[in-house]
Swiss-Prot record:
PANTHER family: BIFUNCTIONAL PURINE BIOSYNTHESIS PROTEIN ATIC, BIFUNCTIONAL PURINE BIOSYNTHESIS PROTEIN PURH. It catalyses: (6R)-10-formyltetrahydrofolate + 5-amino-1-(5-phospho-beta-D-ribosyl)imidazole-4-carboxamide = 5-formamido-1-(5-phospho-D-ribosyl)imidazole-4-carboxamide + (6S)-5,6,7,8-tetrahydrofolate; IMP + H2O = 5-formamido-1-(5-phospho-D-ribosyl)imidazole-4-carboxamide. This is Bifunctional purine biosynthesis protein PurH. The gene is purH. Belongs to the PurH family. Gene3D superfamilies: 3.40.140.20, Methylglyoxal synthase-like domain.
Length: 511
């Protein structure tokens, strides 16, 4: 019996050449609407879907393939005598190949001016039904949803006269991934339209960006997936201009660096190691900002990741060139800067649109057996809600240092303490099990620079021991959430030493 293929695609990439190949193999081709028109315009002989169904395409194409003559031909088990007898009795013929991809729902809702009606009209019904039917019966039906698979199928047909069973199974698995992702986009769109924050089920879809050499450690496998819609200010959608491919750890660190540098509107540079900032500097230009970020911790910056929120110029590039770095991320690089930095063949240079999100996106964290979902912590300091419980208020310079430290501390692993002075961090205490331990690390790192500096804490002081350490180091201003039952003890210590202290009322834990 002559084999038949059904072709109906929205993405017409390579379809003319593929159908030509099918016809050359003696396969009869059925097609619909715009696909049929394109094939005929290219001189290919195809059969209209209405000739198979005996029913016209109706309702603006909404109903054309939803017919027993199509789905019977797709779902019939060819070695089941009952199925074959029923097909013969009803005048049905088997369909052996399905080449279908779906209405461009993703592309439609990505348009800034999309209407709800446009989105709904681009929900495909017949396409998913056909490819699911074909994939279920993949022992007998080859189903292709991705133009990248056209050559594989044609090659096997030319060599073997048929598609290998293993290939059919792989194609079927791809179909169900394809429809699952498609339905996830639709369900998420409708859920967002209804303003539902915590639906009873959560379906997410990501697209493979690249395989990674390994994960956090060489014995772990890893892959990088990106969100289906371009998050322009992200590592996933950054453009790599130079250097080795990104590693798992590179991606994590680059993401952390980007998150911090987005906090600043003035020229800023952030240096990150193991997802914690080791140096942050701001200045009148990017060269000055980098100089301060470097001076914040000239030891830890070695082998680090740098993020800048302004173009890298030649002078800054020459300073960056002096030390070993893994990655430099910036909105752009001047031509002269690229010439300087590209002399280091392994240095990764990324460009990305650096802008702070206007609304909090969802952050997904996997735990054993489950998934935690929360809003990203994008909350900025609201000066209208702060309080100053101490006798002394911060000076203008102290305020400047406090704000810088507060922007940084929320990106440091808890318990987190950050010291800042003169437009740069001078000490970072991260990830300790008690707050005073983190304070001691930050103070030790700052050394003599701690004198006259500002301290930020991501959470309140459960007791005044951190304040005692700060006072001994000569720290003159502190910003913290407040809210401890022992706040009064901390306030008394601050007043004793003449420290100005600000309560924000907002905690910034980071785990």
């Amino acid at each position: 019996m002559k084999k038949r293929a059904l072709v109906s695609v929205s993405d017409k990439t390579g379809v003319v050449e593929f159908v030509k190949g099918l016809l050359e193999q003696g396969i009869e081709v059925i097609s619909t609407g715009g696909t049929k028109k394109l094939l005929e315009e290219n001189g290919l002989q195809v059969i209209g879907i209405s000739e198979v169904t005996g029913f016209p395409e109706i309702m603006d194409g909404r109903v054309k393939t939803l017919h027993p003559n199509i789905h019977g031909g797709l779902l019939a088990v060819r070695d089941n005598e009952t199925h074959v007898a029923q097909m013969n009795e009803l005048g049905m013929e088997p369909i052996d190949f399905v080449i279908v991809n779906l209405y461009p729902f993703k592309e439609t809702i990505a348009k800034p001016d999309v209407t709800f009606a446009d989105a709904i009209e681009n929900i495909d019904i017949g396409g998913p039904t056909m490819i699911r039917s074909a994939a279920k019966n993949h022992k007998f039906v080859s189903v292709i949803v991705d133009p990248v698979d056209y050559d594989v199928v044609l090659a096997e047909l030319k060599v073997n006269g048929e598609v290998k069973e293993e290939t059919k199974r792989k194609l079927a698995a791809k179909v169900f991934r394809h429809t699952a992702a498609y339905d996830a986009l639709i369900s998420n769109y409708l859920t967002e339209q209804m303003g539902e924050e915590s639906p009873e089920t959560l379906t997410v879809t990501f697209e493979k960006k690249q395989d990674l050499r390994y994960g956090e450690n060489p014995h772990q496998t890893a892959t990088f997936y990106k969100a289906p819609f371009a998050v322009t200010s992200s590592v996933a959608y950054a453009e790599q201009l130079h250097g080795k491919e990104l590693s798992y750890n590179n991606i994590n660190d680059a993401d952390a660096a980007l998150s911090i540098v987005k906090e600043f509107t003035e020229p800023a540079v952030v240096a990150v190691k193991h997802m914690n900032p080791c140096g942050v500097g701001v200045g009148t230009d990017i060269h000055e900002a980098y100089t301060r970020a470097y001076e914040a911790d000239p030891v830890s910056i070695f082998g680090g990741i740098i993020a800048a929120n302004r173009e890298i110029d030649k002078a800054t590039a020459e300073k960056l060139h002096e030390i070993f770095l893994e990655i430099i991320i910036a909105p752009s690089f001047s031509k002269e800067a690229l010439e300087v930095l590209q002399s280091k063949k392994n240095l990764r240079l990324l460009t990305v649109n650096i802008e702070k999100a206007t609304s909090a996106s969802k952050k997904l964290t996997s735990v054993q057996g489950g998934l935690l979902v929360q809003e990203e912590d994008t909350l900025s300091l609201d000066e209208s809600t702060i309080s100053i419980p101490t006798k002394r208020e911060p000076s203008e310079q102290e305020w400047k240092d406090l704000k810088l430290a507060w922007k940084v501390v929320k990106h440091v692993k808890s318990n987190a303490i950050v010291l800042a002075k003169d437009d740069m961090t001078i000490g970072v205490g991260a990830g300790q099990m008690n707050r005073v331990g983190s304070a001691k690390i930050a103070i030790t790192q700052a050394g003599e620079k701690a004198q006259g500096s500002a301290l930020a804490s991501d959470a309140f002081f459960p007791m005044p021991d951190t304040l005692e350490e700060a006072a001994k180091a000569g720290i003159t201003a502190i910003i913290q959430p407040g809210g401890s039952i022992r706040d009064e003890d901390s306030i008394k210590v601050a007043d004793t030493y003449g420290i100005a202290m600000v309560f924000t009322g907002v905690r910034h834990f980071k785990h």
